[in-house]
């Protein structure tokens, strides 16, 4: 089980690398889906089922809408692939920064191990269900702030993707 959890963590990092070094929006969607599926499966394997489901619905429901809209506006007949030398260079740079951070920061994190949600002791309420109560009691203000931030991010992305054209309001 430990190897499976560490494999999911590796898939999560590789998905994030694919999103960060995408040459075109087509491949960014693939990296986002890989990272969200791996991250939610990682949480699911650790026993946090509700938070995993909520994050999966938010990632695939919200972020893919933005990617689909940007793909439709940035239609490129010949998109660059991940095999291009610039993209491979970016990927190697990210891996070099990761290795350098591990060398400079030390390898203390290797001794931590993988701990599931109920493995520490006797709990009366699972940690993810306690988090659900926090979502609906104290988290209302944070949800409003997060929703406003996501709406602002949507408009910023739409404005950046639109460029100099008028988008859907162009003259017929």
From Swiss-Prot:
The keyword Zinc-finger does not apply. It is found in: Mitochondrion membrane. One of its GO terms (molecular function) is NADH dehydrogenase (ubiquinone) activity. The chain crosses the membrane at residues 1-21, 27-47, 48-68, 87-107, 138-158. Its EC number is 7.1.1.2. Keywords: Electron transport, Membrane, Mitochondrion, NAD, Respiratory chain, Translocase, Transmembrane, Transmembrane helix, Transport, Ubiquinone. PANTHER family: NADH UBIQUINONE OXIDOREDUCTASE SUBUNIT ND6 (PTHR11435), NADH-UBIQUINONE OXIDOREDUCTASE CHAIN 6 (PTHR11435:SF1). Core subunit of the mitochondrial membrane respiratory chain NADH dehydrogenase (Complex I) that is believed to belong to the minimal assembly required for catalysis. Complex I functions in the transfer of electrons from NADH to the respiratory chain. The immediate electron acceptor for the enzyme is believed to be ubiquinone. This is NADH-ubiquinone oxidoreductase chain 6. It comes from Uria lomvia (Thick-billed murre). The gene is MT-ND6.
């Amino acid at each position: 089980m430990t190897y499976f959890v560490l494999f999911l963590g590796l898939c999560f990092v590789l998905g994030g690398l694919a999103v960060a070094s995408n040459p075109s929006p087509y491949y960014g969607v693939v990296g986002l889906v890989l990272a969200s599926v791996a991250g939610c499966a990682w949480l699911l394997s650790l026993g946090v089922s509700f938070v995993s489901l909520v994050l999966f619905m938010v990632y695939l429901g919200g972020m893919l809408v933005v990617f689909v809209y940007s793909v439709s506006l940035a239609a490129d007949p010949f998109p660059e692939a991940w095999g291009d030398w610039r993209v491979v260079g970016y990927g190697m740079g990210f891996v070099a920064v990761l290795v350098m951070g591990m060398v400079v920061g030390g390898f203390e994190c290797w001794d931590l191990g993988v701990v599931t949600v109920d493995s520490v002791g006797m709990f009366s309420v699972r940690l993810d269900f306690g988090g659900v109560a926090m979502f609906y009691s104290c988290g209302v203000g944070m949800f409003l702030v997060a929703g406003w931030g996501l709406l602002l991010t949507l408009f910023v992305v739409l404005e950046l993707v639109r460029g100099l054209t008028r988008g859907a309001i162009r003259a017929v």
